Amino acid sequence: FAFRPIWRIDHNGGVVIFTNVIILTHDWSFLKGLIAINKVNECISSFHALAYNGVSIGENSFIGAGAVILPGTKIGKFCIIGAGSVVKGNIPDYSIVVGNPCKIINDTRKFGEKFLVRSKES
């Protein structure tokens, strides 16, 4: 049997991925392992990857250090993923998520509005 690279990470640009981030697109579990040996040096193999799901990261999203993105995750645009977060499922656009499992704690549009107000006051 042979290993083939099986991964897919879609993004639309402007994505920042910090250090030590792990993005998983498969779980490398086995349905069946090596089954039998017919003759000396001849093996019959039944290796199959159990699951494969690509990851999608929306434009202008930021993924903090040490975050883990699990297979099949879809991160919306303008999202912030907190450092060390474990992310699974669909993360809506403009979400700020943290934790294990991650939870939405805020909205980047609110953060942007506060930043703009402070910038104008300076």
What does each model-found stretch correspond to?
Residues 65-80, 85-89:
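Beta-rich strand-turn-strand
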